Amino acid sequence: MNEDIKIVHLKSKQQRLQTWIAMFNGEIVGHIYMDIEDEQRIKFLDAWVHEDYRRRGIFRALWETRWNFCKKYYEGWLVYAW
């Protein structure tokens, strides 16, 4: 992945939605979401990378960041994609 791309976690204490964005030179070039549900379930939601920044490993970095977050904080929970 390009070293100038930064993955940033946007934390929300009010909602169960977790968001990560990919930034390049201060611009958002991608995002990925997940929803923390009741009964120890996590729903993987939308993921997107701007077409000008595809094929640089950004989607993979977003996906792995989200997955590692789940493994660290929600081990044993059911994770599914929608």
Listing of model-derived features with the role each one plays in the protein:
Residues 1-11:
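Conserved N-terminal entry element of GNAT/NAT acetyltransferase domains
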Residues 47-55:
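A short, internal acetyl-CoA/4′-phosphopantetheine-binding micro-motif in the GNAT/acyltransferase core
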